[in-house]
């Protein structure tokens, strides 16, 4: 699996996930800087107030 891993407004980058990791995630929340977006491999647990989208195809988490 290959997932995007660039933060918020940075240029797009992606990376290959470890063997057996088939999910990508896109996590969003707001703070004093505005909307923060984090991307990567896997499908992490998140606290309430954080929007999480997980998907299972290459580069699906932009």
UniProtKB/Swiss-Prot annotation:
**CDD domains registered for this protein in UniProt:** TFP_snake_toxin (cd00206)
- Tissue expression: Expressed by the venom gland.
UniProt feature, compositional bias: Polar residues: 1-16
Q: Which domain of life is it from?
A: Eukaryota
Disulphide bonds annotated for this chain are 3-24, 17-41, 43-54, 55-60
Q: By its UniProt entry, which PROSITE patterns does this protein fall under?
A: SNAKE_TOXIN
Which Pfam family, just one, is annotated for this protein?
Answer: Toxin_cobra-type
GO cellular component terms, alphabetically, are: extracellular region
Q: Which residues form a coiled coil?
A: none
Name the principal localization, coarsely classed: secreted
The record's GO molecular-function terms, alphabetically, read: acetylcholine receptor inhibitor activity; ion channel regulator activity; toxin activity
What residue intervals traverse the membrane?
none
Q: Does the keyword Transmembrane helix apply?
A: no
User: What does the UniProt keyword field contain?
Assistant: Acetylcholine receptor inhibiting toxin, Disulfide bond, Ion channel impairing toxin, Neurotoxin, Postsynaptic neurotoxin, Secreted, Toxin
For region Disordered, the annotated ranges are 1-21
Q: Where in the cell is it found?
A: Secreted
Briefly state the protein's biological role. Binds to muscle nicotinic acetylcholine receptor (nAChR) and inhibit acetylcholine from binding to the receptor, thereby impairing neuromuscular transmission.
Query: Which family does this protein fall into?
Result: Belongs to the three-finger toxin family. Short-chain subfamily. Type I alpha-neurotoxin sub-subfamily.
Name of this chain's protein: Short neurotoxin B
Give the originating organism.
Laticauda crockeri (Crocker's sea snake)
